[in-house]
């Protein structure tokens, strides 16, 4: 269990409403949903599908309840202290509570991503986060919402989750 995070969020996490009580709770990271490949392109495109750009950064899961925020890595480690700008972007969202899935990426001045090695080193570094932030600032790209204002969205179709996401996340963060 992530005791320090649970203590920040009141001991047991915020219980979400809905059928998946316990599956998505603020303060308790959940394993990320990962893309899967199909044996043939025709099979992948047979039903409804979504095509997106691959953002090669640090996979992050953001948790917010009121003024409290936590950022978790793909491995479910609490990396809030290492990525303060991600935590700030999460805190600024106009929702009471949320669990979001996204990528944190270092961008060049022209808007193109830095090589992954530079971005990936941010979460793993033991250097001072303020120094790292000045050297390699991160931009946050939230691409999915698992919970918003205490409503669990895990069973909702991607189109519905994206609608909620568009209401709570500005297009540029």
Predicted regions and their residues:
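Catalytic cores of nucleic-acid ligases and guanylyltransferases
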Residues: 1-173
């Amino acid at each position: 269990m992530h005791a320090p995070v649970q203590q920040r969020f009141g001991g047991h996490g915020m219980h979400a409403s809905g059928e998946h009580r316990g599956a998505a709770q603020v303060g308790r990271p959940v394993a990320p949903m990962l893309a899967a490949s199909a044996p043939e392109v025709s099979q992948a495109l047979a039903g409804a599908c979504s095509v997106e750009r691959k953002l090669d950064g640090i996979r992050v899961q953001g948790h917010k309840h009121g003024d409290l925020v936590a950022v978790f890595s793909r491995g479910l480690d609490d990396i809030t202290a290492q990525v303060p700008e991600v935590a700030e972007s999460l805190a600024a969202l106009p929702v009471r509570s949320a669990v979001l899935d996204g990528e944190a990426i270092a961008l060049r001045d022209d808007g193109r991503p830095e090589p992954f090695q530079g971005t990936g080193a941010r979460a793993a570094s033991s250097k001072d986060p303020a120094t790292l932030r000045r050297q390699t600032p991160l931009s946050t790209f939230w691409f999915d919402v698992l919970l918003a204002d205490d409503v669990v969205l895990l069973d909702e179709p991607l189109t519905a989750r994206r609608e909620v996401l568009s209401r709570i996340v500005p297009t540029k963060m």
